[in-house]
């Protein structure tokens, strides 16, 4: 199974979704004062969407900092995005932005804490990504 790296806000929706996956996961620190996370294996990034539909503010700052490290960026295999369908076309926008910029697939979008079906789909994606990367 592919590694999981995730970012979660204080609301904790993304963290709760990742916990339901029941896989080892590393969390991107929220604070600049925390030691930065550096990955050494291919991973799938799971993140929430910020903002009000503006692609410039959809990706959380800590995720941008994490991906600005070329070592971290080189190992990303795909993206899973959380969001809220109340935001219409902006639902999961952060995932689309990161997938486009990193040239990796957007594997799935889930609402709030996700459903059992979302969990099953993401588990399948993680297993597939691990097969693809070796």
Swiss-Prot record:
Gene3D superfamilies: 3.40.50.360. It comes from Chromohalobacter salexigens (strain ATCC BAA-138 / DSM 3043 / CIP 106854 / NCIMB 13768 / 1H11). NCBIfam families: nrdI. HAMAP family: NrdI. Probably involved in ribonucleotide reductase function. GO terms for biological process: protein modification process. PANTHER family: PROTEIN NRDI (PTHR37297:SF1). The gene is nrdI. InterPro entries: Flavoprotein-like_sf (IPR029039), RNR_Ib_NrdI_bac (IPR020852), RNR_NrdI (IPR004465). This is Protein NrdI. Pfam families: Flavodoxin_NdrI. GO terms for molecular function: FMN binding. Belongs to the NrdI family.
């Amino acid at each position: 199974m592919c590694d999981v790296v995730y970012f979660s806000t204080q609301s904790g929706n993304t963290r709760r979704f990742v916990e339901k996956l029941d896989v080892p996961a590393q969390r991107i620190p929220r604070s600049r004062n925390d030691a930065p996370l550096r990955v050494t294996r291919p991973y799938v990034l799971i993140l929430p969407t910020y903002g009000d539909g503006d692609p410039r503010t959809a990706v959380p700052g800590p995720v941008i900092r994490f991906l600005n490290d070329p070592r971290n960026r080189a190992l990303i295999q795909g993206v899973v995005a959380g969001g809220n369908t109340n935001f219409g076309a902006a639902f999961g926008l952060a995932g689309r932005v990161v997938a486009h910029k990193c040239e990796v697939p957007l594997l799935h979008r889930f609402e709030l804490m996700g459903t059992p079906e979302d969990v099953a789909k993401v588990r399948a994606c993680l297993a597939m990504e691990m097969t693809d990367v070796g």
